[in-house]
Amino acid sequence: SSELEGMKIAGNTFDYPFIHGKAIQATGKYSFVSCSDEAVENGIVTLEDYPIVDYILGLEKEDASAKAYYKTFSSAMQRIISSYCQSGGNILVSGAYVGSDMNGTQGNREFTQRVLKYGYQGSLTDKNSNRINGLGRTISIPRLPNENNYAIPAPDCIVPVDSAFPVFTYVPGNQSAGIAYKGNYRTFVLGFPFESILSEADRATVMAGILGFFTQK
């Protein structure tokens, strides 16, 4: 668009595992390995070998015009994650389209609601809202295109299902931005990419809170 002409815009750099890993390392308690979703789908990596899984979606969604096919959760990945949860796993999911990309069919909605314990309640279109409250702090994410961070124009409003509970809310407006579930397994789902949190200190604190939720008795 014309107002963006001549402006460098940050896009997908795919170093998200590094950003997540740095926040994990900041806790001083955990080590991590990263792999592609294809490695998991092809059985090269088994989720059950890990007590905690961090599923990084970023800006991935199904896009008919894209050359590559991306779906937030492919059918194979839905089966693998369901099995991991049934085995008592802990999974963190974050991305800008975790709800909207899975809302199209009954089967996809059943997976997100029954297994991951969240429902979709629209996307956040108010561009002035870049603050999120949760875990005892206020964090910020970039909503408009800029040179330093990739923008999140329409993060998802996701709501808790069953006994899950809201953990983050968009400000102002108070729509739910993230949920957590604690049962025979635990889930923590963010309607925005974790790596889009602007402050490194905030990322470290939020990650410590999430890992604490997964590991507390």
Positions of the model-derived regions?
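Aromatic-Pro/Gly-enriched surface loop or interdomain linker
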Residues: S1-I52, I56-L59, F194-S196, A208-K217
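Soluble non-cytosolic domains of exported or imported proteins
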Residues: A10-F18, A68-S75, A201
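Residue-level detector of buried hydrophobic side-chain packing
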Residues: I24, V53, G88-I91, N184, ...
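Extracellular/periplasmic catalytic domains that process cell-envelope and extracellular macromolecules
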Residues: Q25, V45-D49, Y84-S87, V159-V161, ...
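Active-site-proximal beta-strand/loop segments in catalytic clefts of secreted hydrolases
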Residues: S36-E38, Y55-E60, S94-V98, T169-P172, ...
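A glycine-rich, often tryptophan-bearing local segment used as a flexible ligand/cofactor-contacting loop or short
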Residues: E60-F165, V171-P172, V206
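C-terminal and late-domain segments of enzyme folds
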Residues: R143-R186, G191-K217
